[in-house]
C-alpha cells in the first residue's frame, strides 16, 4: 500500500484519534480497554454477580449488548416513535445466568438505558467513549463470523457461497465507524452496496430529494471504502465506475459481483484485530493491571498475553464438546474465522478443525432452551505462539498484482504457501467482458491468470514465542503443501439469519 503514510493506523481509527505516535496509540487503546474493564466490574457489582458468574462469557455478552443497545441512538429514537407492544424504549436487558444449588438458572434483567449510559460514562472518565463501544461491536462481529456461515445472505444478493471468506464483519451495525469499516471484508461491502442499488431499482424515490442526496453521499462513501480495500489499479478503476454511475442499476451489480469474485485471488486488504469479551478486560483491571500506563495493542502480543492469564467460563449444552466451544471462542478472540487452519493450528498449538466438524452450537443461549441440563466449563483460550495481525490480503507481491490465498483471508502475518486450484475459480469468469468496464475486466482476468500458486505469502514472516514480546526471533513454520485449511468449506454451519 503506497498510501500508507496518509492512512491512520487502525488503532487510531479504533480510538477516534488523530495521527499519533506508537506510544500515544498504545496509551489510547489502553485507555479504551480499561474503560471497558471498569464498566464491566461496575456492572458485576450492580448485578451482584459472584466471581465465577462474572467470568461467564454468556453474562459478559449480555452486559455488552445492554450497553450497545443503550447507546444505539437511532434505534432508541425509532422505538420511541413507533411504540411496539411490550417493549419499553427506555429499558434494556437480557439473560443473566446464576449458579443456584449446583444448577445454572437464567434470570431476565431490565435496566434503564439512562442508568447504563451513566455507568459507562463514569467508567470512561465522563466521556461517551464511542471507541470502546465499537470495540465491543467488533468482538460480537468476530464471534458471529466464527459461528455462522452467511451462505443464505450471499445467495440472496446474487453472490455465491464460495465467497464466504470475503464476508468478515457482515453483521457489524452501520454505526461502527472507521474502525468497523476497516474490518469489513470485500464481500460485506459488496453486499451492502448491492442491497442499496436494489432498493434504488425498486423504489424510484430512493435517490431523489433531500433524503436521496444523503443516500447518494452514503453510496459514494461506501464505494470509496471498498475501493480502498482493493490493491490493484484495475479493481480500483472499476470501483470508480460504480461510484460515478448516474443511476446505479444492474450493470453496477454485475460489476460488483465480478469484483467480489476477483477478490478471491486478488485479495483486498482487510484489518484484523483481537477484540476480547468485556469480562477479560474486567478481570485484568480488577487484578490491578494498568492498561493506560502499560499501553495496549490489538494487533500485537497483548491480547495473547491477556488470554494466557484469564480464566473464562462458558455454559455448555448437554451434547456439546467443550474443546470445540473453546476453539470457537479462540477464533473469535483473534478474528481468525477466515484464516488458514494450518496457520491457526500452529499458533494455537492444538489442531483447529473446520466448522463442519465442530460439535458445538453458538455461544449465546436462546431464551427457550432448557437450563436444567446446562453445565459450565473453562474455555481454553491460551496459545502456543503469538503472531502479528495483518491487514494485507496476503498477496504474494504487493507491488504487482499477485495471488492471495483463495478461501482464506489471512489474519496473521505468517509465511504460508498458497495451495489453490486456480481452475475452479477461473471457471467463474467465463463469459461477459463486454460493456463499459470491459478493458478493466480483461486486465483483472489477465492478472488472475498469471497468479502462481507456487508462491508464498508473507515471505519470511513467522510466529513468536510468548516470551518474545519484542518480536525478535521469528519462527517460520513449514506447512503441508496440498492441504489448504479453509474453515467453512464442505460445511453445514448454522445460518446467522435463522
From Swiss-Prot:
GO terms for cellular component: helical viral capsid; host cell; host cell nucleus; ribonucleoprotein complex; viral nucleocapsid. It comes from the Viruses. A motif (Unconventional nuclear localization signal) lies at residues 1-18. Its main location: virion. A motif (Bipartite nuclear localization signal) lies at residues 198-216. Late in virus-infected cells, may be cleaved from a 56-kDa protein to a 53-kDa protein by a cellular caspase. This cleavage might be a marker for the onset of apoptosis in infected cells or have a specific function in virus host interaction. One of its GO terms (biological process) is symbiont entry into host cell. Residues 1-21 are annotated as: Disordered. It is found in: Virion; Host nucleus. GO terms for molecular function: RNA binding; structural molecule activity. Keywords: Capsid protein, Helical capsid protein, Host nucleus, Host-virus interaction, Ribonucleoprotein, RNA-binding, Viral nucleoprotein, Viral penetration into host nucleus, Virion, Virus entry into host cell. Pfam families: Flu_NP. InterPro entries: Flu_NP. Belongs to the influenza viruses nucleoprotein family. Homomultimerizes to form the nucleocapsid. May bind host exportin-1/XPO1. Binds to viral genomic RNA. Protein-RNA contacts are mediated by a combination of electrostatic interactions between positively charged residues and the phosphate backbone and planar interactions between aromatic side chains and bases. Encapsidates the negative strand viral RNA, protecting it from nucleases. The encapsidated genomic RNA is termed the ribonucleoprotein (RNP) and serves as template for transcription and replication. The RNP needs to be localized in the host nucleus to start an infectious cycle, but is too large to diffuse through the nuclear pore complex. NP comprises at least 2 nuclear localization signals that are responsible for the active RNP import into the nucleus through cellular importin alpha/beta pathway. This is Nucleoprotein.
Amino acid at each position: 500500500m503506497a498510501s500508507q503514510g496518509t492512512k491512520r493506523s487502525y488503532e487510531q481509527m479504533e480510538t477516534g484519534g488523530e495521527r499519533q505516535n506508537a506510544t500515544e496509540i498504545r496509551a489510547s487503546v489502553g485507555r479504551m480497554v480499561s474503560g471497558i474493564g471498569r464498566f464491566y466490574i461496575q456492572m458485576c457489582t450492580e448485578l451482584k454477580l459472584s466471581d465465577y458468574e462474572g467470568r461467564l462469557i454468556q453474562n459478559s455478552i449480555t452486559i455488552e449488548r445492554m450497553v450497545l443497545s443503550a447507546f444505539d441512538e437511532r434505534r432508541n429514537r425509532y422505538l420511541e416513535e413507533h411504540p411496539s407492544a411490550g417493549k419499553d424504549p427506555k429499558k434494556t436487558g437480557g439473560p443473566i445466568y446464576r449458579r443456584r444449588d449446583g444448577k445454572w438458572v437464567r434470570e431476565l434483567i431490565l435496566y434503564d438505558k439512562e442508568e447504563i449510559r451513566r455507568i459507562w460514562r463514569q467508567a470512561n472518565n465522563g466521556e461517551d467513549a464511542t471507541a470502546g463501544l465499537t470495540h465491543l461491536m467488533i468482538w460480537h462481529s468476530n464471534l458471529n463470523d466464527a459461528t455462522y456461515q452467511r451462505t443464505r445472505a450471499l445467495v440472496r444478493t446474487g453472490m455465491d457461497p464460495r465467497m464466504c471468506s470475503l464476508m468478515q464483519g457482515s453483521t457489524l451495525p452501520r454505526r461502527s465507524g472507521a474502525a468497523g469499516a476497516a474490518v469489513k471484508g470485500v464481500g460485506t461491502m459488496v453486499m451492502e452496496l448491492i442491497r442499496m442499488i436494489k432498493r434504488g431499482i425498486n423504489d424510484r424515490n430512493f435517490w431523489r430529494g433531500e433524503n436521496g442526496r444523503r443516500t447518494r453521499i452514503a453510496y459514494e462513501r461506501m464505494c470509496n471504502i471498498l475501493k480502498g480495500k482493493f490493491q490493484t489499479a484495475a479493481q480500483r478503476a472499476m470501483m470508480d465506475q460504480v461510484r460515478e454511475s448516474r443511476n446505479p442499476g444492474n450493470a453496477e451489480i454485475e460489476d460488483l459481483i465480478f469484483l467480489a469474485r476477483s477478490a478471491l485471488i486478488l485479495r483486498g486488504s482487510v484489518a484484523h484485530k483481537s477484540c476480547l469479551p468485556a469480562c477479560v478486560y474486567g478481570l485484568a483491571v480488577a487484578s490491578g493491571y494498568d492498561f493506560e500506563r502499560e499501553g495496549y495493542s490489538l494487533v500485537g502480543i497483548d491480547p495473547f498475553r491477556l488470554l494466557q492469564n484469564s480464566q473464562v467460563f462458558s455454559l455448555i449444552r448437554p451434547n456439546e464438546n467443550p474443546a470445540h466451544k473453546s476453539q470457537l471462542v479462540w477464533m473469535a478472540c483473534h478474528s481468525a474465522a477466515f484464516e488458514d487452519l494450518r496457520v491457526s493450528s500452529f499458533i494455537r498449538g492444538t489442531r483447529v478443525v473446520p466448522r463442519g466438524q465442530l460439535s458445538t452450537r453458538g455461544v449465546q443461549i436462546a431464551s427457550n432452551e432448557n437450563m436444567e441440563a446446562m453445565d459450565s466449563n473453562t474455555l481454553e483460550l491460551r496459545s502456543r505462539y503469538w503472531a502479528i495481525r495483518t491487514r494485507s490480503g496476503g498477496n504474494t507481491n504487493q507491488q504487482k498484482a499477485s495471488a492471495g490465498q483463495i478461501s482464506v483471508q489471512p489474519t496473521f502475518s505468517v509465511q504460508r504457501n498458497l495451495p489453490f486450484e486456480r481452475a475452479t475459480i477461473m471457471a467463474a469468469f467465463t463469459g461477459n467482458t463486454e460493456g463499459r468496464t470491459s478493458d478493466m475486466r480483461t486486465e483483472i482476468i489477465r492478472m488472475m491468470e498469471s497468479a502462481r500458486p507456487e508462491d508464498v505469502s508473507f515471505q519470511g514472516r513467522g510466529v513468536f514465542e510468548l516470551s518474545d514480546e519484542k518480536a525478535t526471533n521469528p519462527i517460520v513454520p513449514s506447512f503441508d503443501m496440498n492441504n489448504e485449511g479453509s474453515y467453512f468449506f464442505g460445511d453445514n454451519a448454522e445460518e446467522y439469519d435463522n
